[in-house]
Each structure stands twice: as structure tokens, then as C-alpha cells.
Amino acid sequence: MSRVCRNGVLATGDATPGSFPAGALFFETLALRAGSVECLDDHLLRLRAGLDRAGFAPGPLAAGDPSAWRSAVGLLGGREGVLRLVVGPDFEELGLRALLPSPEVFRLRSLSTLRDAPEWLPRPKSAPWANSLAASVELRSLGVGAGVEGVQFDARGFVSEGSRSSLAWVEAGALHVPAETTGRLPGTALGQLIRCAGLPVRAVETGVPVRAEAILVLRSTLPGGASAVSHWDDVDGRPLWSGDPALARPWLASLAAWRAQRCISFA
């Protein structure tokens, strides 16, 4: 157990992945670095879309009230970590956990845990996120290291997203992303990449993109919001794709520059 800020007051809680307070509806995870919250507005737009669709009004944190955020971040007392905002019908809970080191290059591993059907499209980031947690459990059971991200497919066999990340790849001069119909989340870092990559965008329903020139793992808590991929293996560990991670550098740099302009300090 740790301390969380619940409705503006410090309380006992648990901000670890997979642990949610009773009544949790939606959540967002954000990076806190050097006292600044990264891309807060992007996360809150997605959160409010879910609340609006479910018929709930946003509280001060979900509404982006600067004074509420400054107070909550101050109460938690950290300058670096992963902030998790969880909202329910009658509460907002902001927690802070450690920001673990992130690999510069990922290896992908196909998983057998299928992406479940979303409540609606575009998919809301709803608690308790049980399907992604099951995918993460499967990935850990394979005995892989921290530099491996699991990939979920929908029931038709199309690439959906990573167990903790969004996916995108460059192929034939275009940025390819899984279509929303695969059940993937509208990831915040993915949305930013779409806007700043400078490439035509194709939303696709496809299996493993074996002709991709570069593949990216996108996650809001990664430095710069993304990392490159070097290999993609099937569920049994057999190779499906490999590439030079350096080819992803132009898009990683563009995304990092975009995100650097969207940090808010509550110090």
C-alpha cells in the first residue's frame, strides 16, 4: 500500500498496475519528470471522452483545474514517477509510483491472449483493464526480460496493440497503425506521432507487418513517448521480423520534440 490523493486529501491506496479502488471507471497514466507532467491535456481529453460517453461529469482533476493538480502533485511529494489518475462516480484518485528504467530498443513477442472487444469505439481506457493485465501476466510467464513487449491480436488475427503500449510501423512511405476496429486504445503518444510524423497515415487490419521498414512501441511513460523495435517473435519465440532500430530515429526525434512542448510544471 502507498499514499494517494483522493478527492484532494491524502489517503491510503495502491497505485500499482492492476490494482484499482472499488468503483473505478476510467484511468490515465502520465509521466512526471523533473516536476513536470507530460502531455496532461492529451490524457485528459481521452479521459473526459470516456466520462462523457458514460454520462459522468468530470471532477477538478479530470477537468484539468491547475490548482487541483498543483495541490495533488504537491501532496504526493514527488518530482519523478508515474502518475495514475483513476476516476469513479464519486471520486478522483491520483497516485504516484516509481518510474522504472526504459529500454531504448524493444523486442516484440506475439501473445495468445486475444484483445477483448471494447465497450465502444474509440476504445475507452476503462478500469480495471483486466484484458491487458492478463496479457502482461502471459508475457511474464514466458520468462522474457524488461525489453520485451507483448503483442495482442483481435479475434480475427489482426494486430491490435501491445500489452502496455500502442504500435505503429513505417512501410512503403506511410505510417501504418492498427485500425480502431481491432480494439486498440487511441493511445496518446500514438495520436501525437500521427500528427507529427510527416507521413501519410493508414489505419489497417493486418497480421504481423513483415514488410515494415521500422516499428515503434509507443507509451506515454517512455522517454520521448516511444522506442524502436529490433525483432518480432511469434508466441513460441520463433522470429517473424527484424530490422535496424536506427531507421526509426527521425520519427522518434519528431515525437520527442512534439511532447517536449506539452509539459506542465506544477512545482
Name what the model sees in each region.
Residues 1-63, 68-71, 88-267:
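Helix-start/capping segments and mature chain N-termini
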